[in-house]
Each structure stands twice: as structure tokens, then as C-alpha cells.
């Protein structure tokens, strides 16, 4: 289900629906604040939370990949702990791409497991304990910023610069899980992801934020595929599929059809067969995101191309300084 348009009107000009739903948004914010007062488990290794204030996709998965790689470059074995949204396993269980499917552990953990060790646990504290027992030198908590069950040593809030914090209101009046001021008061860093124009607009709409701000962009990973002039039928079931379609166009692909699916939508045989027939009729190649690709039926994995993207920081010095303060210790 796509988010309603009134979530993204300017904060100083809320739509009628947002104003009518404001009391429910205030109740949601109050419930979140009460929940956050609960005590949490203190791990024996640093816990880095990659969270957001918005419901839906903001770029947490590419951020987790970038942090895994950054920590690996320091000699640190970081394990990701995720709730495993969309998967059936409650865990704690370590994700194994050889035996797990997205229906078992969720698409994001399955993708992250290609870059390092990843765990799924409905009980995040139990997942952290399992990862620590398995030798993790640092924990990357995928989401969970509004979950108090684990004490965080570093919290990085990720926001899509193109949409910012929407109308600044909490669910269901707006896209927020908690008020911006309350969330950023607990955060250590804010990462806004987007191109130069989106970054300028975000800085104008949300000036004087009480937390250091990093900027970055999602860049296409060059894998030898020449996209210029390629006729494609693109499909994506992510938070903002239009970003994926825009990336393909920026690479020079000719999008003959773009199908936006619901976030985490299952890619069953019937759906994929329909898309395959449409692509054949158009003379187009099926293309999707890395995160969607892990949900493909086995019979379609060789038929669908992916456009991988990676997070590139404009200046990662503030992040590196924050990691330095964690006193991470690499094992020999």
C-alpha cells in the first residue's frame, strides 16, 4: 500500500486529513514515548543502531551494507541483527542464504547476509546475545530505534532527503514513528540520502537540526552491464520504487514499463509470469532491485537483471569520528 499524499505536504501547510488525524498522531507519539522508558539489555560489544523516524523505506539497507564494509576495513567483525520483517522465523537464527528464503527470514536480512553475518530475531535482545555469543565484535541493529529492548551505543538516523520528515506529524496523521525533536534528541548522527537538489531542499525545510548531519547518495554499482538504450520492464517492491526507476533512467535505460509493487510484496509465480509475458510482448528485459531479487522464485532468478546501488558518503569524517569513540577492538 502506497503512503497517502497528505503525509508529504509542507509542515506549515498540513492537509485537512492531517489536521483531522492529529489527535491520533499525538496519541501514537505518547505511546512511543512511554514504551521508550523501558530498560534495555546492555551488550558486551558496541551496538550501532541504523534507524529512522519515518515509516517505510529511507535507505537503511544500503546504509547497513556501507557500515558493514566500513567496519570490516577496520578489522571489525560486525553482525547485523534484524527483526526479519516479512519472514516466518522468530529466531534468533543466523541467516544462511543456502537454506533460507525471503519467506523464512525477510528480504533485507537475506540481502545483508551476502555482506557479512546477519541474524533474525523477533526479540532483538535475544538476537544481540546470540550474535555476541557467535563472536560479533560489534552489532548493527537494523531498525529498532524506537525499540528500547537493546541499549544503543551509537544511533544513526537515516532520512530520504527528497521527502524529509514529510509533514512532520506522527502516524496516522503523517509518516513519523515519533516526533522529529524527540527522535533526534536520542540520536548521535543524521544521514540524509539524496542528490544535490534534494539535499538543498532538505536543509531548507529542516534547518538547525540538533544533531550532526551527514550526506550521501545512492550510486549505481558498475557490474559491466551497459544500460544505455536497454529496453526494460522494471518492477520494484521497496519503500519508494520511483527512486529505482529514476536510477535506471539516469543510466540511460529505456523504461517501457515500470511497475511499482507494495513494499516487501511477495513475488509469486503468477505475478512473475505475468511480468515475463508483458516483457516479451514489449521486447524488454525484466529488471529489479537487489532487495526484490532475493524474493524471486528460483525459476526466475536467471531471467531478471538487477541494478545494484551502494551508499557513497559525501564526507564520512563525522561517522569515522563516532566509530573511533566506540573503542572498537579487532580480534587477531
From Swiss-Prot:
Bridged cysteine pairs (disulfide): none
Organism, scientific name: Cereibacter sphaeroides (strain KD131 / KCTC 12085) (Rhodobacter sphaeroides)
Sequence similarity: Belongs to the LpxK family.
Protein name: Tetraacyldisaccharide 4'-kinase
Reaction(s) catalysed by this chain's protein: a lipid A disaccharide + ATP = a lipid IVA + ADP + H(+)
Superkingdom of origin: Bacteria
Entry keywords, A to Z: ATP-binding, Kinase, Lipid A biosynthesis, Lipid biosynthesis, Lipid metabolism, Nucleotide-binding, Transferase
A Pfam family that the UniProt record links to this protein: LpxK
GO biological process, any: lipopolysaccharide core region biosynthetic process
Gene Ontology molecular function terms on file: ATP binding; tetraacyldisaccharide 4'-kinase activity
Pathway in which the depicted protein is active: Glycolipid biosynthesis; lipid IV(A) biosynthesis; lipid IV(A) from (3R)-3-hydroxytetradecanoyl-[acyl-carrier-protein] and UDP-N-acetyl-alpha-D-glucosamine: step 6/6
EC number: 2.7.1.130
CC annotations in GO: plasma membrane
Positions with a binding annotation for ATP: 54-61
Protein role: Transfers the gamma-phosphate of ATP to the 4'-position of a tetraacyldisaccharide 1-phosphate intermediate (termed DS-1-P) to form tetraacyldisaccharide 1,4'-bis-phosphate (lipid IVA).
Amino acid at each position: 500500500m502506497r503512503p497517502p499524499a497528505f503525509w508529504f505536504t509542507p509542515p506549515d501547510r498540513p492537509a485537512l486529513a492531517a489536521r483531522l488525524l492529529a489527535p491520533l498522531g499525538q496519541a501514537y507519539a505518547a505511546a512511543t514515548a512511554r514504551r521508550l522508558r523501558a530498560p534495555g539489555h546492555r551488550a558486551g560489544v558496541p551496538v550501532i543502531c541504523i534507524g529512522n523516524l519515518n515509516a517505510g523505506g529511507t535507505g537503511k539497507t544500503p546504509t547497513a551494507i556501507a557500515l558493514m564494509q566500513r567496519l570490516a576495513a577496520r578489522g571489525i567483525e560486525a553482525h547485523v541483527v534484524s527483526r526479519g520483517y516479512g519472514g516466518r522465523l522468530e529466531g534468533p537464527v543466523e541467516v544462511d542464504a543456502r537454506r533460507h528464503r525471503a519467506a523464512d527470514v525477510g528480504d533485507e536480512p537475506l540481502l545483508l547476509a551476502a555482506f557479512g553475518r546477519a541474524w533474525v530475531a523477533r526479540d532483538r535482545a535475544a538476537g544481540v546475545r546470540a550474535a555476541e555469543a557467535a563472536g560479533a565484535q560489534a552489532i548493527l541493529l537494523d531498525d529498532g530505534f524506537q525499540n528500547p529492548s537493546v541499549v544503543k551505543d551509537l544511533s544513526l538516523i537515516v532520512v530520504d532527503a527528497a521527502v524529509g520528515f514529510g509533514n512532520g506529524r506522527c502516524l496516522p496523521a503523517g509518516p513519523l514513528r515519533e516526533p522529529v525533536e524527540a527522535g533526534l534528541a536520542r540520536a548521535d548522527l543524521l544521514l540524509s540520502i539524496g542528490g544535490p537538489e534534494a539535499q538543498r531542499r532538505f536543509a531548507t525545510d529542516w534547518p538547525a537540526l540538533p544533531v550532526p548531519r551527514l550526506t550521501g547518495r545512492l550510486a549505481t554499482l558498475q557490474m559491466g552491464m551497459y544500460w544505455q538504450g536497454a529496453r526494460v520492464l522494471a518492477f520494484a517492491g521497496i519503500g519508494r520504487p520511483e527512486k529505482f526507476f529514476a536510477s535506471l533512467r539516469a543510466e540511460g535505460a529505456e523504461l517501457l514499463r515500470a511497475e511499482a509493487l507494495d513494499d516487501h510484496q511477495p513475488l509469486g509465480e503468477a505475478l512473475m509470469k505475468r511480468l515475463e509475458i508483458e516483457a516479451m510482448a514489449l521486447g524488454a528485459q525484466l529488471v529489479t532491485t537487489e532487495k526484490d531479487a532475493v524474493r524471486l522464485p528460483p525459476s526466475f532468478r536467471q531471467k531478471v537483471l538487477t541494478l545494484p546501488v551502494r551508499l557513497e558518503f559525501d564526507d564520512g569524517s563525522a561517522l569515522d569520528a563516532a566509530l573511533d569513540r566506540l573503542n572498537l577492538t579487532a580480534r587477531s
